[in-house]
Amino acid sequence: AALSLTAVPFSAFAAADKSAAAEDTSLLTVESAEGENPLYVEQHTYSDYYDVYSGSSRPDVEIMMPGAEYDSTEGGNFSVGSYGTEGDAKDNVLIWDSSEGKVNYKFTVAQSGVYCAKMSYFPLETTATTIELSMLIDGESPYDTASRITLNKRWVNEKDIYVDSRGNQVRPSQIQSGAWMSTYLQDVDGLFNDPLIFYLEAGTHTLTLSGVK
C-alpha cells in the first residue's frame, strides 16, 4: 500500500445518488441468508448493496480508528512514528512501507446504520500512480468495490511547460508531491458520485485493510 495513515473514521453521510452512468449488473446475484437476519444478503456488486441498505438510518456519530492503534498486522513492513514533509509532519501515525501485508483494527459501533469511511493518509513515493487497498469487515468483503479501494496521489509538473526548438509547447514529466490528504472512499467504477456506504450493526467489529498495489 505504501502510505502513512493517521485515521480511518466511519461517519454518517447524506444519501448518495447514482450518476447517469449505466450500471454493470453482469455479475449480480442475490441470495437470502436462510435462518439469519433477513437484512443480510450475499452481495456481488455495490449497486445492489446500495439498493438494499441506502434506506437504513444514518446515525449522527463518528467512529474513529487512529492508524497507529491497530489490533494486529500480517506481512508487509509496518511501523509507528512521525511522517510528512517539513511543516506538514504528523506524529504517531502508521507507516506502511510496502505494497503487501494487511492491518486489522477493532472498533465498536454504538448504533446500527449506514456509515461512510474517510481516510487521512500520506502516500509514500513509489512508481505506482495510485494506492490500491482491499477492505474487509469482519473477515468479509461487503461488495466487490470494497476489494478495489483506490486512493489518489498528488502529482505536479516537474518543471514549467516550455517551448522546444521547433516552437512546440512541451508538457514536462509529472512527479509525486508529498502531502497529507483526506478523502471519503469512493466508487472506483464511477457509477456513484457520493461516498461508498457500509451498513454496520451495533457491536464490535474488525476492519482489515490489505495492500493490493
Segments the model singles out, each with a brief description of its role:
Residues A1-F13:
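Sec-dependent N-terminal signal peptides of Gram-positive bacterial secreted proteins and lipoproteins
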Residues A15-K213:
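Extracytoplasmic
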